[in-house]
């Protein structure tokens, strides 16, 4: 599953009407930011918390930032 994560995709709410706070990796700032997820579909740049977002995107794509969790 984690091999298919694309950290370069923009956040995608999806067609459902939920309001779930999730995290996505923002490539330009190399940080994880929150967005409102509808609850279904969307894309793989979608994480339940900042820890997993940084784990799968910042370290994998850019190496450890050296500043701790952002």
From Swiss-Prot:
Keyword field: Disulfide bond, Protease inhibitor, Secreted, Serine protease inhibitor
Primary residence: secreted
Pfam family, one: Kunitz_BPTI
Gene3D superfamilies: Pancreatic trypsin inhibitor Kunitz domain
Tissue expression from the record: Expressed by the venom gland.
PROSITE patterns, A to Z: BPTI_KUNITZ_1, BPTI_KUNITZ_2
Keyword Transmembrane: no
GO cellular component, one term: extracellular space
Site (Reactive bond for trypsin): 17-18
Top-level lineage group: Eukaryota
Keyword Secreted: yes
UniProt xrefs under InterPro entries: Kunitz_BPTI (IPR002223), Kunitz_BPTI_sf (IPR036880), Prtase_inh_Kunz-CS (IPR020901), TFPI/VKTCI-like (IPR050098)
One GO term of the biological process aspect: envenomation resulting in negative regulation of voltage-gated potassium channel activity in another organism
BPTI/Kunitz inhibitor domain span: 7-57
Localization (cell): Secreted
SS bonds (residue pairs): 7-57, 16-40, 32-53
Record-level Gene Ontology MF annotations: potassium channel regulator activity; serine-type endopeptidase inhibitor activity; toxin activity
Family: Belongs to the venom Kunitz-type family. Scorpion delta-Ktx subfamily. Delta-Ktx 1 sub-subfamily.
Further information: Negative results: has no effect on chymotrypsin and elastase. Shows weak inhibitory activity on mKv1.3/KCNA3 potassium channel.
Function description: Serine protease inhibitor that inhibits 85% of the activity of trypsin at a molar ratio of 4:1 (Ki=760 nM).
Protein name: Kunitz-type serine protease inhibitor BmKTT-3
Organism in which the protein naturally occurs: Olivierus martensii
């Amino acid at each position: 599953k984690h091999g298919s994560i694309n950290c370069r995709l923009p956040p995608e709410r999806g067609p459902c009407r939920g309001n779930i706070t999730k995290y996505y990796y923002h490539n330009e700032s190399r940080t994880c930011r929150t967005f409102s997820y509808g609850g279904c579909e969307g894309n793989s740049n979608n994480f339940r918390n900042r820890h997993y977002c940084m784990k799968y995107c910042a370290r994998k794509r850019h190496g450890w930032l050296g500043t701790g969790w952002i």
